Amino acid sequence: MGPLSAPPCTQHITWKGLLLTASLLNFWNLPTTAQVIIEAKPPKVSEGKDVLLLVHNLPQNLTGYIWYKGQMTDLYHYITSYVVHGQIIYGPAYSGRETVYSNASLLIQNVTQEDAGSYTLHIIKRGDGTGGVTGYFTVTLYSETPKPSISSSNLNPREVMEAVRLICDPETPDASYLWLLNGQNLPMTHRLQLSKTNRTLYLFGVTKYIAGPYECEIRNPVSASRSDPVTLNLLPKLPMPYITINNLNPREKKDVLAFTCEPKSRNYTYIWWLNGQSLPVSPRVKRPIENRILILPSVTRNETGPYQCEIRDRYGGIRSNPVTLNVLYGPDLPRIYPSFTYYRSGENLDLSCFADSNPPAEYSWTINGKFQLSGQKLFIPQITTNHSGLYACSVRNSATGKEISKSMIVKVSETASPQVTYAGPNTWFQEILLL
């Protein structure tokens, strides 16, 4: 590759232009009508290729010129020089791949990462007492883009129901990413969204129109590579299952329950869930007809749910909305508070009765078998010995038809009165409280 065979100029950088376009230091003492121009051909180069730093508008009466690697013009960074009449001198920075031409252009062959960076050209003019003109030029090196591949979070998404994340691999510095669908640029749709770097493509609610094929392309200024196409295997949408049940208000340990998972299909398998856990195998649980029906011969208050059923195919499944039972139970044996039975005349009697029950139980009180009142509390102020007797709290659940009572004996004693006795002369009277 030589300066005479270079293509037409596509990038010109003058000593003045270097400061603006590449932020490079420069100075010159040539007339403005004869500014030297350096042109990189090609303007962007990839590793393993050749690049020519082509110099234009050289001044007359040159003695020679020197190329340096970097911006320091010392012996260590000296690449090569050209002296008028054809003498070429190589320096310590010469790698064997640089060629200098009589027009000051520098050819670098088979460039590597070490060749990237700035270069300094020092031009020496005959009779120039200032030492010549020095300018700088920067070579940016790009790698060939690798062939990309597409990774997917889910190659078998449910139609409309599931989202998919596509990633263009590998992550490549100084490169841009482009996605194509059916060989065309991505359509404008709310179902497709790109990440900030364009490397990741999100598909929301995949439909047959955006199932693929997808391709991704990695580009940099010197090359572009495209992946193999990827097409999503769009699965049919699973129907939302639901539970039917013969009784939502069963009586504890009495009623038989039958849950059915709908819809019915031989293409699905059925799974039952209780409290978010797969229902364990138990002698109490019957599952006839391919597990679609769940039978509980009896149910307790601890098995209210929630219950869910799931339908599955070989790719995945979907659960129903939860169903919670209203288990009717009780009343259990009531409890009376406080439980002590001895009182004195004049005290207040304040009793409360509690029993576990669903729905809440109905309460009533009797004394010695005679009905007193309805409710959980029994309050009698300033009781007397006439209030001694058998107190009973009865509880009843109209939904279960169960009734049960609890009784206790209350004993009320007389309050003792003070007794006065004479203890003799010059003594105090004493009050003795007889218990």
From Swiss-Prot:
Disulfide-bond pairs as recorded: C168-C216, C261-C309, C353-C393
Domain Ig-like V-type, residue spans? 35-143
Q: Where is this motif: Cell attachment site?
A: 126-128
Q: Where in the cell is it found?
A: Secreted
Q: Which domain of life is it from?
A: Eukaryota
Tell me which residues make up the Ig-like C2-type domain: 148-233, 241-326, 334-405
Q: Name one GO biological process term.
A: female pregnancy
The name on file for this protein is Pregnancy-specific beta-1-glycoprotein 6
Q: Which organism is it from?
A: Homo sapiens
Q: Which gene encodes it?
A: PSG6
